[in-house]
Each structure stands twice: as structure tokens, then as C-alpha cells.
Amino acid sequence: MKKFLLILLLNISMLSAQENEIFLMRFHEMEVSGNQSEFISANKNYFKPLASQAIKDKKWAGWQMLQSVTESNKYVFIHYYNSPKQYETSKDVFSSAVAEKLGLKSPNMNSFEWKTTAPMDIYQVFSVASGNSQSNYWVKNDYKFNDRQKFIDNHKLFAEIVAKQMQKDMEGFNHGAAINLTFEKYENEEMVSYNGVSFDGAASLEQLLTNRAYKENQETNKTWQKIGKKFTDEVEKKGASDFATAKKTTIWRLVDETWGD
């Protein structure tokens, strides 16, 4: 079967994958009290090497640590898996025995406390648009949708039409989208839980905020006018304009990551 390059959602690195493979990501959201610097140091110097070794041992595909820009004591760790089978069989990633083999010194855990603040939901990555530069900041968009296909179609069209131009105009722009596979809650036939997510990257916080800011009397950009019309037309053809009933946006800084290199 023909292979294509599946870009890890929040990373420039590429991996080869079959078209029908199911690539997963799991979120671990937490809140930390105490010494934030010590917490970050523990993850960079102890847990990151263990995560990297787990990739080499094919226990998972990648590890990332993000910190909230607006609430600096909040973090989200993203774990990547090449398949549901890899997720199911992944064990002892942060094993003390492995740490000993690697010569890692246990961090001082007395200077901070952490607690998990949300279910560790598993998402399927279905769309990725990767540029040629690193994203150091991310806009995370959480969505509620009733029609999965509309959500998927809309984001695939965004990746194909809009993201390509964004990558020309904005350094560090990378984009990806995924759907929640492990939790859904309906009330009166309406989705009340967030069941979709997308990420839009930027090289710097300045760039990200500038791109999102309102600009008065901005000149019409004919290129973007044309792209916007094409995107709108294609979305209407697919019937994917009303793809979400709610949206929540947060901004995150990339603290560290490893893909086994």
C-alpha cells in the first residue's frame, strides 16, 4: 500500500505510516503548586530521557510538555502512539529500573505538588499540515460537534487550502486536528462534552498575538481574499460550514519534547 509522510502533530519531524493506520495522542493535563522551575527541571532532566528511551523501545512515538501562557501553573503533556496496539501494550514508560540503567538521578519531588485535572482522553489525529519551521507556541482549540464527518471535512479543507498559505506568511505555523475516541456526552441529542481539538502553531508569542490581533483599516490582501473564497466555496460544497456548536481557545508554550532522537 502506498505510504505517505504522517507528521507528528506538534513537531516538524516526520514518520512513515500506512494510510489506514490510526495515529493516537493522549492528553495528561495537570496543575502544579510550589516551585515551577523545579517541576520543569524534573521533566527536562529525568522524565524526558525516560520518554526518549520509551520511544527507542517502541513503547510510544513521542512526548511533549506544554505550559499555559495565561496560567503558568497549568501544564499539558501529550503522549503519541503509532497505533492502538502500541497504546495498549505500552507499559512502564517511567520505570525506575530503566532510570537506573540510564544513570538518571531521581529529582527532588518535595518542592512541588501536582494533580491531574482532566481525564486522560485519547484522540485520533486525522489531519496535519506541517511547515518547515518549529512551533514554539500553540493555540489549542477545543470543539464540541454533533457531526463528526463535518468536523473532519472542515479541518481537512483548512489544512489543504488555508494552512499552506499560512506557512508562507507566518514562520512556525503548523496545524493539526484530532477527534476524541474515549469520551462523549450527549444531552437532548446535543453534544455537551468537547470531542474535537485543533492546534495552530507559531514561532514566537509575539507572532502569535500579532496574528490574532485586530487591525484597523487593514488593507485588503488579494491573495487571502482569493484563498478565503476558495475555502468557503469548498466547505459549502462539502456541507461542512456548521461543523461545531462550541469552541474554547487556550494558548500554550512548548517547554520540551522528544521523538527518540
What role is predicted for each listed range?
Residues 2-3, 26:
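Basic side chains
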Residues 3-13:
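Sec-dependent N-terminal signal peptides
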Residues 17-100, 104-261:
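Short S/T/G/P-rich N-terminal loop/turn motif that feeds into the first structured element of a domain
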